[in-house]
Design a protein with these regions (language model features):
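Flexible active-site lid/hinge loop adjacent to a nucleotide/diphosphate
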Residues: 230-340, 345-349, 384, 453-457
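Walker A (P-loop) phosphate-binding motif
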Residues: 182-227
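Long, compositionally biased, glycine/small-hydrophobic-enriched stretches that function as flexible linkers
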Residues: 1-141, 147, 158, 162-168
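Buried hydrophobic packing segments
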Residues: 145, 209, 213, 249, ...
């Protein structure tokens, strides 16, 4: 098995330099992603002066031919077009992701040469090169270990040089080139795990769930756009809302409960880092960071955010904002358990959930109310939740609802959920950069990280 640094430049593919057909990037996806539940690779093409759908058709055809040459007969290529371009995704085994990326690039180069009227690139020599790379990259022990973990219901974390089975206090990590023949599974296990995504409110909701875990006496940790923390210890500061943050957190042996803030960029660049979360929250979806990786509209962005459902374990709960039209529209095709939350008990999704005996949460008469599908619980009044500023910060009522439903899905009792809500504050200690209030020369000054029109509207 070749190491990742040896595979980075294993094949030099002559991609045409023409502004009308540009391969803007090709990257490996280490876990579930926008396109499907499996790891793989995806390429982004920028197309001008050609019909994107026709270009994608030709690109897909070459990719399928090369997959057949590799013997990957079960790999289902997926493509999508967007305004001014196309994406092509190829699923692959965990030890064939470089090969999949090279295949996408090779198929693009041959397609572009043809469409631009350049000298034809021979296909068979390229297929031989791909077979060589596939053989060099192959790591049967890694593939077998990951497959066995999946059969046992145990999650995995992957990077270029290591593999981890389980989470936190139940995790074991090996170098990918020195895997055990027969690992001792006795103490390998997952821990309660939630994902949080959305345009705004991700970090606050992530911090809230972790605070609920701590209130329940667990060693709770989180990864976020600002830091990775286990208990009260910050392991590192920076934007850790992608797979690197998840690995840093979930490999800590002290950890008993985890919350991952999952940003759009991490999902699109590397896929989701885990496969067996118990809960995933989508706070909302609004225009932000559009125009990257082929995501041009709010509707397309909603599809990216809701792809977190692919990282849920069987029976895991997807927790969605019923007051967000983009979230509601993007959820219609999903076949996973959904818990809706809303600022009104009369929202259609809340009414339907209550009729169907499904979990949900809502705001009514100044109270945060939860239902497990059988029993309704008056959890707490917003006057007792400092984060809501007496109910004025309605966006934080939504965040509290999503966090409470996630905490329940992680198996936490209502008492610590209620306790965390009553203690957690919008101050630089509990929630830095989020509606932090200061007194300056007799004036009340609020500092908030609001950075897009949706968040600015929410805090004004």
């Amino acid at each position: 098995m070749a190491r990742s640094d040896e595979l980075q430049d294993a094949l030099d593919i002559p991609v045409p330099d023409d502004p009308s057909l540009v391969l803007d990037g090709c990257r490996r996806l280490l876990g579930p992603n926008l396109y499907g539940p499996s790891p793989g690779a995806v390429g982004d093409a920028l197309i001008a002066g050609h019909v994107p759908r026709q270009v994608l058709h030709a690109w897909t055809g070459l990719a399928r031919r090369m997959l057949a040459a590799l013997g990957w007969h079960e790999a289902e290529v997926r493509g999508r077009t967007f305004a001014g371009g196309a994406n092509l995704y190829v699923p692959a085994e965990v030890d064939q992701l470089f090969t999949a990326a090279y295949l996408i690039e090779a198929a693009w180069a041959i397609t572009a040469h043809d469409l631009l009227g350049l000298a034809a690139m021979p296909v068979k020599p390229m297929e031989e090169q791909l077979r060589r790379i596939a053989a060099a990259e192959a790591n049967p022990p890694l593939r077998d270990l990951v497959a066995t973990a999946a059969r046992k219901g145990i999650d995995r974390l992957l990077d270029d040089d290591a593999v981890t089975l389980g989470h936190g206090c139940g995790a074991v990590t090996w170098d990918s080139s020195a895997l055990p023949d027969a690992p001792d599974w006795t103490h390998i296990h997952d821990i309660p795990l939630a994902l949080v995504t959305g345009t705004n409110g991700k970090t606050t909701t992530t911090r809230l769930i972790a605070a609920m875990g701590q209130a329940a006496g667990r060693v709770a940790g989180l990864s976020s756009t600002e830091f990775v923390r286990v208990g009260d210890e910050i392991l590192d500061r920076g934007d850790y809302s992608g797979p690197a943050g998840a690995r840093l957190l979930l490999r800590d042996p002290r950890l008993e409960l985890a919350v991952l803030e999952v940003a759009r960029g991490g999902i699109l660049r590397r896929g989701l880092p885990v496969t067996r979360a118990q809960a995933a929250v989508v706070t909302n979806v609004a225009a932000d960071h559009l125009g990257q990786y082929g995501i041009m509209t709010v509707a397309e962005l909603a599809e990216v955010k809701l792809s977190v459902h692919r990282a849920l374990m069987p029976g895991g709960l997807l927790i969605l904002n019923a007051d967000d039209p983009a979230v509601v529209r993007a959820s219609t095709h999903l076949a996973v358990p959904i818990a809706w939350f809303s600022l009104s008990p009369d929202t259609a999704q809340i009414a339907a959930a209550r009729d169907q005996g499904a979990a949900c949460g809502w705001f009514e008469n100044g109270r945060i109310v939860l239902s497990d599908g059988r029993n309704i619980t008056d959890l707490i009044g917003v006057a007792e939740v400092p984060l809501t500023l007496g109910g004025a910060a309605r966006y934080n009522i939504e965040n509290a609802l999503g966090a409470a439903l996630a905490a329940r899905a992680l198996g936490l009792p209502d008492a610590p959920i209620r306790a965390a809500l009553s203690r957690f504050r919008s101050d630089p200690t509990d929630n830095p950069g989020r509606a932090n209030e200061f007194s300056v020369k007799g004036a009340r000054v609020f500092v908030d990280f609001a950075h897009n029109p949706h968040s600015i509207a929410a805090v004004t």
